[in-house]
Amino acid sequence: MTNANMARSSILVALLLAVATGVVAQEKVHTVEFYSPAVERTMKYNIVLPEAYEASDERYPVLYLLHGLTSNYTAWSRQGAAFYAGLAGDLIVVMPDGGNSWYVNWAENEKGQRNDWEDHIVKDVVGHVDGNYRTIARREGRAITGLSMGGYGGLTLGLRNPDLFVSIGSTSGALSYARRNAAEARGEVAPRARRERTAEEQAGLEARQARINPNIGIESFSSQAERTPAGRAFATAEGADAYDPFKLVLQVPHEDLPHIYLDSGTEDRLIGDARAFAQVLFENDVPFDFMQMPGGHNGTYWTQSLGHIVSIQYEVMRRALGERPVRRSRRP
């Protein structure tokens, strides 16, 4: 092992131990509550500010991190977001909540809900962050990435809104979500078979889904049942196509495409999605960064992945801005 690899391994081991023992600087993670018109409810996000933020008048680039299915806005904090943001120094990290929505504007809603989750992120969260913090509120100062469902969201929202983000990414992304839905709607594949549950199994499932997670703390949005939209994400195959990153990346003019980052663990069942998307990019001469590392679909892998995400996407923003964005000036 080279000295560089030994150093990286030592940093990762130290971070994993810190995360496991809860000593990562959680005091740097702030929870913000705000009203989101797109989903007509009060929501929360976590934010990490640069150490010099209070003593500076400068504006900072922002990295948005999207969580996975059944998770929430606290997930990335547990993977070391504050630690890695601190290594970058001049970076704001925002971790919004998207419930179990797949980050799309739902075509059909039930129970009186409004589920415009794409708009929640790209309009309400980004708007609230830009309106309340000293951000670099333009494309060059924003990047977005997510894990699993959030990896799908990071690429899809970035490709549907290429004017908002200079870099987009996915780690362990479930990138075939919309493509599978479109294929089922067209009758090209059979709907996924679901095993029949016994009455006891169904009762147990409903009890688990109704259980409130006190760590979320969002009124009427803290159990899996509450966090799962009622309705249909896509009413037609065409509706699913509109949220398919495999199609979207071919519709954005090359000169308007954001930087694209992909990674996946080699033991992750979703690595095929990442490889298939990378193949589409390669065949169409779209520049991208792709990384495969040992690991599965789990927190240990994502803690390691986050270090690469922050380093690469921060550097893309820094270069797009033309200089190191913060001079660390202090107020008198």
Language-model segments: what does each one mean?
Residues 26-332:
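Non-catalytic cap/lid and distal C-terminal segments of serine-dependent acyl enzymes
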Residues 20-21:
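N-terminal signal peptide c-region/cleavage motif recognized by signal peptidases
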Residues 1-12:
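Bacterial N-terminal signal peptides that target proteins for export
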